[in-house]
Amino acid sequence: MPQGDPQGEPAFREAIRGYLHSARGVNCTAEQIVVGAGTEYLLMLLSRILGPDHTIAMENPTYKQAYRVFESLGYPVVPVEMDGSGLETSLLEGSGADIAYVMPSHQYPTGIVMPVKRRQELLSWAYKKEGRYLIEDDYDSEFRYKGKPIPALQGMDGRERVIYSGTFSKSIAPAIRVSYLVLPKPLLAVYKERVNFYTSTVSRIDQNILYQFMVSGCYE
């Protein structure tokens, strides 16, 4: 059996695209999706796309594994304090960071849900300077304890500044090491130039099983 598409099987990526659009309000094409074995792997892949000269801002407290990945890759990491609405954008401006890693839908470990106004402030920060990006980790958006979910930050972005990250590990089982990135179109072009030769780290068999699960309607 051939190795398949480095980004993930086209039909599987199209199923992810359809689900993200209907469930999370994410606006993308299947071509913008990159499938990989776990969020940590995809963050390492993302580092090859972004390059070395960046400073990463992260919510304090945050997901320690992502913090360790960024540190191990040599990025300066700046913790930014939160209030009841999430990461404080006024502090972000003075942090010196040009990339911010955030979990607006259900911040880990605090559980804060970032309101729309704060999300708009984050986007305004990203738009102020060329080369700024937001990494949106939407790791467990399928779960809600009360109220309706707020659509993803990516769906509010009109200037291609949000890198969206999702996973099947929380919604199905931790052993399902299948995650995905939605790359802004400018970064997709860089991906194809720099790392498109990497073989997909998720087997075609696993991708097809998940694809069948999604198109059958069982996932939703």
Segment roles from a protein language model:
Residues 163-220:
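PLP-dependent aminotransferase class I/II
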Residues 2-131, 142, 148-156, 160:
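Conserved core of the PLP fold type I
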Residues 145-148, 175-177:
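Short aromatic-enriched loop/helix-cap "lid" or pocket-rim segments at secondary-structure transitions
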Residues 8, 145, 201-205:
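A generic short alpha-helical patch detector that favors 3-5-residue windows
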Residues 137-138:
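Walker B catalytic acidic pair
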Residues 64-69, 97, 133-134, 144, ...:
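A generic "structured core" feature
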